[in-house]
């Protein structure tokens, strides 16, 4: 029996798993299941599963190639299909180094970033970007070349991670639409961990820090800090070995800055650099942990705006433990 089946049967009270089309459990099957938020995205999204390009791989060392792939991706399909609606869209919360929570969004100037954003699945814009860079298909095989070699890459994440697997298939389709061959590769988790942590990949997917007292700063390091580039084994971030001196200057300055306006300027500039250079590309917003409850035995679990301020941390982590004191037996 899978965890999902046990949860739906009522053998598990609280689940921390991704369930495709979660809302169908109560809308169609009429099960006593609820989430922290009643409406889509149903969860409190605080992390950003992200595409990383290996900038030491020929072709992917070119901004035009990385950005073209980023522009061509159908993010709405990622969110509606791969995530089955369990994420805000980038129209709702435009991409930046920030997660979609109100506290972090207040720390970035989204108006200043508007000119650097791209529309969803902008295939024609991506093609033009590549054409203008002289990266074209010269032999008619449907694949563009750079330095005489086809742009052909492998994108990987662990097998069995259904939402991530589906997301990379959408990325691969985006590549095909603009003349870049991207093949998906779904190894066992142990092999995937070895690949991304040692730089043995071309395109990979990883999820960064969520919400904590160390963020958004540590997430910015995760996205773009060159401090990790010389590590033989790196589980910390910037897996594609991106190098940008201005990024490093800002990251060195932030811990010493106390002025909120200046910090906002720094985080806005980091967002601008990420959007312009595309060393990595956030693909969706996602819960730090999933929080689904089956109320066949216990009820009164925490929900958004219920006045308790207990976070959706599965009743086990940090102040989330406080949820246990509010539970009531259904037949009590």
Residue positions per predicted region:
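Bilobed periplasmic-binding protein-like "clamshell/Venus-flytrap" ligand-binding domains
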Residues: 80, 133-158, 207, 255-294
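Paired acidic/hydrophobic, glycine-rich loop segments that form the ligand-binding mouth/hinge
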Residues: 13-18, 202-207, 282
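Ligand/substrate-recognition segments at binding pockets and active sites
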Residues: 1-9, 117-119, 135-211
